[in-house]
Amino acid sequence: MQSTCVYRECMRNHAAKLGSYAIDGCREYSQPSTGDLCVACGCHRSYHRRIDVISSPQINHTRFPFTSLRRVKQLARLKWKTAEERNEEEEDDTEETSTEEKMTVQRRRKSKFTAEQREAMKDYAAKLGWTLKDKRALREEIRVFCEGIGVTRYHFKTWVNNNKKFYH
């Protein structure tokens, strides 16, 4: 197994003193003949993103069936791991492959509110000033309101934060 490193784009923040963020656009470290300063941007090598590349000739990709995109990504990650990490992951993968084909990806369910719930939340949020911060004294009242219209406090808070720019 052979290990080398490659330096990619410059990550130096040139506007840090101003409290902002600005990079110079250098896409890859250009090795100078002497020293560690990049020929392209003049920054030290340590400012450039380092990628450790471990090449491993013993992995034969044709012996692995590609059952899903997830499996392909696992194999790509596996290519760059150490032998010990690779053995542990291969053991875990053999248990997952049979159930992996059966599982379907479930997306997070989006909350849907009725027109009455939206109108009630809009009126109550206007009464609160479109913020729930510093409303600890009203916490119980907010809980009762949410139970009354059939939404959780979390969903009400999220709805207020997402909609205050439209109604406030």
UniProtKB/Swiss-Prot annotation:
A zinc finger (ZF-HD dimerization-type) spans 7-51. Residues 106-168 bind DNA. The record marks V160 as: Required for DNA-binding. It is found in: Nucleus. Keywords: Coiled coil, DNA-binding, Homeobox, Metal-binding, Nucleus, Transcription, Transcription regulation, Zinc, Zinc-finger. Residues 86-98 have a biased composition (Acidic residues). One of its GO terms (molecular function) is DNA binding. Residues 76-103 form a coiled coil. The keyword Metal-binding applies. Its main location: nucleus. It holds the Pfam family ZF-HD_dimer. InterPro entries: Homeodomain-like_sf (IPR009057), Homeodomain_ZF_HD (IPR006455), ZF_HD_homeobox_Cys/His_dimer (IPR006456). PANTHER family: ZINC-FINGER HOMEODOMAIN PROTEIN 14 (PTHR31948:SF131), ZINC-FINGER HOMEODOMAIN PROTEIN 2 (PTHR31948). The homeodomain differs form the typical one by having namely 4 instead of 3 extra amino acids inserted in the loop between helix 1 and helix 2. This is Zinc-finger homeodomain protein 14. It comes from Arabidopsis thaliana (Mouse-ear cress).
